[in-house]
Amino acid sequence: MNKPTGFLEKSYDPYDPWMGPRGVAIRDAFYKGKFLGKVSAAIVVLLDWLFPNSLRLFLKVQPRNYPITVAQKILAAEQIDQPQIALAELMSTSVPDKSRFGNAWGLGFPWMSKNGLYNEHVPFITHTPYAMEALCKLMNYEICRDEATRDFFGTWQFMQSLLILHEDADTLALSYAPIDEPRIVINANTYACFAYCLHSQKNPTHKDEAKSRAIKIAKYVVGQQQENGSWYYYADKLPGNFIDCFHSCFVIKNLIKASKLDAEIELLAREAIAQGKEYIDKNFFDEKTGLVKRFTERDIKDPFIWDLYDQAEYLGILIDLSEFERADQLRKAARSKFCRDDIWYSKIDFLGRRWGKNFSRWGITPFEYSESKLKKSGQGNK
């Protein structure tokens, strides 16, 4: 992948039906347990499953750019011929309110979750670290080094805008976004841990504070691990909690990344990483197909059995842990199932049908990013 430009790529998305006012209202009613909300949500899911193209045409959905895919494409590139253009494209997807958030990135569309409504301009800790990594990569190019460095420093304001949802002498947990939230999201805090580690390494002004916060967050996350090695999505036992593959991989991935930047985190997270990986191997990996399954505990059902996002993130941690042979086997298995005639699909349903043609954000770009890491390791053959 050697592109002078082209990191901006508009595409459709699984969340298309839920981005408009009507979709937001339906999800809100669904999460509140209202009967009409449940019925309406079921109808939308059914239509989206059976007639995804027609539904998007009816809803007048337009493809859009997604901040996370821009960052991941920059990270996947072997060489960037025009890094100043890549930087401009990356920054063009950041949230507009710099006075409040500094440099930060979000989903790029409205999202109604169990925690409430996040508008399209709300930045997320689950997205901003990818852009931070991309900025660190762009710092290596002299032509844009100073600007990329300033933009990276500008993410500190966002980090400090996150709300403290838990803190004691040893541990810390932050919000998913800089708004009031009723529940702590565990994987989001691993992103915060990694982001603070990046600041500890790259931002001398805030080195000590960043390191302290990263360690406290890592201790919190490790403390939330279940005896069997798993992590729930939320740090509570309230209804609606679940354990799925790619969010579990997020936790492990970010602990690995943080461990590579901080020796103290490496020591305190080592066993948790090993136990978390073992849980995925034993409970998500399917020997028959060579793929990883979606859930071990779930709260909402849909028609889909396999998800490319799960394969992408599991592939990433296999590479991070130097399990290159298994990584290449997974890569080949996923390609054989989700890719046909060089066209990628995001999901596979219980009928064996591929769904989500070229939905870049959902699994496709993350998989390409993980593949690029395998290629750079010299262990994978396309």
Where are these regions (language model features)?
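Contiguous N-terminal and early-domain "leader" segments and peripheral loops that mark the onset or edge
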Residues: 1-32, 57-80, 129-132, 193
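Structural helix-adjacent loops and short alpha-helical linkers that scaffold large soluble proteins
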Residues: 1-5, 9-12, 78-88, 136-154, ...
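Glycine- and aromatic-rich loop/turn segments at beta-sheet edges
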Residues: 13-31, 37-61, 93-119, 158-183, ...
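Well-ordered alpha-helical segments within folded domains of soluble proteins
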Residues: 64-79, 120-139, 183-201, 240-260, ...
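Long, hydrophobic, well-ordered secondary-structure blocks that form the structural core
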Residues: 128, 137, 146-171
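Loop-centered beta-sheet repeat module
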Residues: 179-202, 207-232
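A beta-strand-loop signature enriched in Asp, Gly, Thr, and Trp
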Residues: 251, 257, 262-315
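Short hairpin/turn module used for nucleic-acid contact or packing/dimerization
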Residues: 332-382
